[in-house]
Amino acid sequence: MNPTETKFNQDMRNIYVTAKEDLGYTASRFMQLVSQKGGLQAARQLILKEGGTYGFEVLWENKRLDLSVEALVLQPEYESLFSDEERMLCRNRLEEFGYF
């Protein structure tokens, strides 16, 4: 794992911690997926999921899409980890839900 992937993996774990602390939302399946597949593969699986995820819905309802995997994927420091198509999916989903 290169340094960028390592940092991304840690930031994925931080999503779980922050959502739990700030919202009282325990995203057990999310953390299980990150632990099993690593942050990068977990993110790819989640962003490609048709119809989005329950966790995204919880974050949207609480006006915290800044904690979404989609928002993390779009951070400039992680551009090299994802394809243009993956990043476009994230941007489109966030735009659809009023993040931008």
Language-model-derived ranges and their functions:
Residues M1, N14-T18, R29-F30, A43-Q45, ...:
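Charged, low-complexity surface segments at secondary-structure and domain boundaries
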Residues D11-R13, Y25, G51-Y54, L67, ...:
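Accessory DNA-engaging acidic/polar modules
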Residues Y16-R64:
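Amphipathic alpha-helical packing elements
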